[in-house]
Amino acid sequence: EGDEERTLVASQRIKEEGLEDLVTVKLMDYRDLHKSGLTFDRVVSVGMVEHVGHANIPLFFKNVDSVLKEGGLFLLHNITNLVEVEGNKWITKYIFPGGYIPTLREEITVAADLNFHVLDVESLRLHYMKTLQEWVKNFEAHLDEERKMFDERFLRMWHIYLCSCAAAFHYWDIDIHQTLYSKGINNTLPLTRSYMYED
């Protein structure tokens, strides 16, 4: 599923829910946000910052800053490392060329330089470990179909990747966090997370 298809699916779901007047989906390169002339109350990034590369993390945050209104919220959902390391050479070579898994410390330091304030941080490590374990089961259950699309070398590589990532989350080599920032001061959110679970 490509970016264009995901954009269409998201737009269709928004329409089905009758939210067209409230929500718009835009397919854009993060490096072009500052040129867009757009402003948002909220920005959400899911699993994207890992793909910009270590050197571009400040640029990523600057572009979010350029479109987020004062007091606006920025939710960053991404895989994180415990310490600053180059990353797994095998994964960097075969799975995510140019990728880099940042630490919370790196992200928060860059964010603070731009007047972003941390409102909440949640680890979803165990959730993602279970997700990866289910992906492994699903992958193994559909090998006959996958063999029609990919060669054995790729299938072995992908299987190793999924299993090793599940193990990395299990043994806390890596984590996955949702970090909620405000641009400047935002004192409007409830004091606890309970509002997130209300209908």
Where do the protein language model's features map onto the residues?
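Class I SAM-dependent methyltransferase SAM/SAH-binding core
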Residues: 1-33
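Serine-hydrolase catalytic core recognition
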Residues: 39, 60, 76-78, 84
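A conserved beta-strand element that flanks and buttresses the S-adenosyl-L-methionine
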Residues: 44-49
